[in-house]
């Protein structure tokens, strides 16, 4: 049985992470769980920026940002759907794996 540690990350934090020099490129982000009945309407409206984040696999490791992991358990996961103007929309569950 897997144990996940959940964090709720607000859009302004997420966008700061994305635009920071090498924090976001340190992670491989995979879409894990989507509460499709809730999120589908937002996905249908479409946000190309969001889809780019979810689809792109970034494997460049960061030497400046290190996060502690407990064994091999996935660590961070909740990010928010971003609107065109980066306001908070809705949470989706992500698995984020540190690329070492």
Swiss-Prot record:
Subcellular location(s) per record = Membrane
Ribonucleoprotein as a keyword? no
Q: Indicate how the chain sits in the lipid bilayer.
A: Multi-pass membrane protein
Q: Where are the transmembrane segments?
A: 9-29, 41-61, 72-92
Q: Name one GO cellular component term.
A: membrane
Superkingdom of this entry's organism?
A: Eukaryota
- Keyword Membrane attached: yes
Q: What is its main location?
A: membrane
What are the record keywords, sorted?
Membrane, Transmembrane, Transmembrane helix
* Other known facts: Partially overlaps YOL036W.
Protein name, please?
A: Putative uncharacterized protein YOL035C
Taxonomic source organism: Saccharomyces cerevisiae (strain ATCC 204508 / S288c)
């Amino acid at each position: 049985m897997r144990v996940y540690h959940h964090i709720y990350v607000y859009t302004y934090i997420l966008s700061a992470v994305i635009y920071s020099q090498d924090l976001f490129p340190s992670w491989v982000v995979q879409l894990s769980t989507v509460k499709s009945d809730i999120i589908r309407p937002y996905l249908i409206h479409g946000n190309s920026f969001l889809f780019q984040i979810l689809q792109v696999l970034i494997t460049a490791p960061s030497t400046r940002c290190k996060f502690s992991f407990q064994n091999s358990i996935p660590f961070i996961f909740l990010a928010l759907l971003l609107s065109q103007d980066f306001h908070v929309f809705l949470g989706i569950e992500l698995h984020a794996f540190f690329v070492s």
